[in-house]
A protein has these predicted regions:
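Histidine phosphotransfer helical core of two-component systems
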Residues: 1-26
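Short beta-strand/loop element within the Bergerat-fold HATPase_c
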Residues: 103-115
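Short alpha-helical Gxxx[C/S/T] motif in the catalytic ATP-binding
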Residues: 149, 153
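Short conserved segment of the HATPase_c
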Residues: 128-138
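Conserved micro-motifs of the catalytic ATP-binding
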Residues: 41-44, 76-79, 141
Length: 186
């Protein structure tokens, strides 16, 4: 900067350099925010949650494509509604992103299996090429991803005494995410 005469492209070089610094700073900020969210998941504050109402609300929040609903039996679970909503929003968002790759659809539904509730999100995307890293913190295949979405989802499921699994569908193309929760407590 102290050189005289200044190179003709100095301003362009400085702008490019500042652009790189800004991009890396933004990426680091996203990483740190994600890390903090992972480290500070609060314990669930449970109350009765009507699953039909929760599923309808989550489906209505998606604006990129309509999300089908496969209604199940009337079911109430004791859970943290905000945490379950965040979990389902993330699963639906992932399903929509996958379905947009193929022009497919997304459906969310639920069913009872004895004293367990299964909430599932089916997409008609390309499916999962590999499942080993699905729940590895900070692993992502998305350009702007943080790699914590499914990790947080699994933490929420487990904090409620439940499980979360993802697998390629057997009944057609795409993936099925299944949240299993105890009915009547957790």
């Amino acid at each position: 900067l102290d050189r005289e005469p200044r190179p003709a492209d100095l301003e362009d070089d400085v702008r490019r350099g500042l652009g790189v610094i800004t991009a890396r700073s933004d990426a680091l900020s996203r990483f740190m925010t994600a890390y903090a969210r992972l480290a500070r998941l609060p314990p669930p504050r449970t109350a009765p949650v009507d699953i039909a109402e929760l599923v309808r609300r989550v489906a209505s929040l998606e604006t990129r494509m309509p999300v089908g609903i496969a209604a199940g039996p009337d079911t109430v679970v004791h859970a943290d509604a905000d945490q379950l909503e965040q979990l389902l929003i993330n699963l639906v968002r992932n399903g929509v992103e996958a379905a947009q790759e193929t022009g497919g659809a997304v459906r969310i539904g639920w069913r009872r299996d004895g004293n367990r509730l299964e909430v599932y999100v089916d997409d008609e995307g390309p499916g999962l090429p590999e499942t080993a890293n699905l729940f590895v913190p900070f692993f992502t295949t998305k350009p702007q991803g943080t790699g914590i979405g499914l990790v947080l989802c699994r933490q929420i499921a487990e904090a409620h005494g439940g499980t979360l699994t993802l697998a390629n569908r057997e009944d057609g193309p795409g993936c099925r995410a299944v949240l299993r929760l105890p009915v009547g407590g957790g």
